[in-house]
A protein has these predicted regions:
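Surface-exposed substrate-engagement region within the catalytic domains
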Residues: 210-216, 229-280
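Cell-envelope/ECM-targeting effectors and their regulatory/trafficking segments
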Residues: 1-147, 151-153
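Solvent-exposed loop/turn segments at secondary-structure junctions
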Residues: 130-132, 147, 153-158, 186-191, ...
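Structural recognition of the beta-strand scaffold that forms the well-ordered cores
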Residues: 61, 123-127, 146-151, 179-184, ...
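Generic structural signal for well-ordered alpha-helices
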Residues: 137, 170, 204-208, 240-247
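Substrate-binding cleft of extracellular glycoside hydrolase catalytic domains
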Residues: 157-230
């Protein structure tokens, strides 16, 4: 709700909405919000009356993401520019002709205010539940991808179509010039899955056995999914204990290949679990 309120404030500042927003779940950083964002980026010294409200929203966006700008008055100064630059670098926005370092364009604002960021940005990695054949792997390579995430176990859909990676598929992926990273997800779509923290130990064991079976190299990171948006207290109460059990299992003698545990989920959840030192 806090993040959505930021998008709502942006829409009000842009003039996209002039009415009181009574349901934040209806707020979306869509085409209208994107089109109304200034063509000229927010930047150091850009402090006219038109930009002050937008600068202020960017300042709160920085704060929400852990980059305290030190002020919330809408004045874009060199300190704020430094925080924007650090945010852009950490979230992989630089070096792909998407942003100007230290300036807030619409892509940076999307990343500040939404978990998914700019969905139109280029990417080097993807994931899929489809068992890839040779042509599909080549298509991904030709589309500019270099890494593909694939699932170690499970099925998808009401017809339970297998989604787990196979040895033949690995050959197809590698022959196309792609690298593959393993994902474990046999649940995790809703909070109830995480309410018993020992589920983490069960999932850790299942993932390690599956990785060993198909020859995943020692030391590889296996990504465990949290596939829904959590409130902060839910992360503390349920997600952290779940990953604590994963971490404990991965650090035990049963992890003979010394695989590492990673996390795959919303930005805040990933950051919080990482801050606890439970994932690599």
């Amino acid at each position: 709700q806090t993040a959505l309120s930021l998008v709502g404030a942006l829409q009000a500042a842009e003039g996209v909405t002039t009415e009181l927003i009574t349901d934040l779940n209806s707020v979306n950083f869509g085409d209208a919000t994107t089109a109304a964002f200034p063509t000229e980026s927010l930047k150091n010294g850009q402090n006219t009356s038109e930009y002050i409200p937008l600068n202020k929203i960017a300042q709160y966006g920085l704060y929400f993401n852990g980059y305290n700008p030190g002020r919330f008055d809408g004045v874009y100064d060199s300190s704020m520019s430094s925080k924007v630059k650090a945010f852009q670098e950490f979230y992989g926005l630089t070096g792909i002709d998407l942003v100007t370092s230290g300036e807030v364009n619409v892509s940076t604002m999307k990343s500040l205010s939404t978990s998914k960021g700019d969905v139109n940005r280029s990417a080097k990695a993807c994931d899929c539940a489809t068992v890839l054949n040779k042509q599909q792997a080549l298509d991904l390579k030709n589309a500019g991808f270099s890494h593909v995430g694939r699932y170690l176990t499970g099925s998808v859909g009401t017809e339970h179509i297998p989604k787990f990676i196979t040895l033949d598929e690995i050959k197809c992926i590698e022959s196309a010039g792609l690298s593959v990273f393993p994902i474990y997800q046999d649940g995790g779509y809703e909070l109830d899955y995480f309410k018993n923290p020992t589920q983490g130990s069960i999932d850790a064991q299942t993932a390690i056995l599956a990785a060993e079976r198909i020859g995943v190299p020692a030391g590889t990171t296996i990504y465990f999914a949290v596939d829904f948006d959590c409130y902060g207290y839910q992360v503390d109460t349920f997600i952290i204990p779940y990953f604590a059990h994963i971490n404990m299992f991965f650090n035990s003698f049963r992890n003979k290949k010394k695989y590492k545990a990673g996390i795959y989920g919303p930005r805040y959840v990933c950051s919080k679990v990482s801050d606890y030192g439970l994932v690599s």
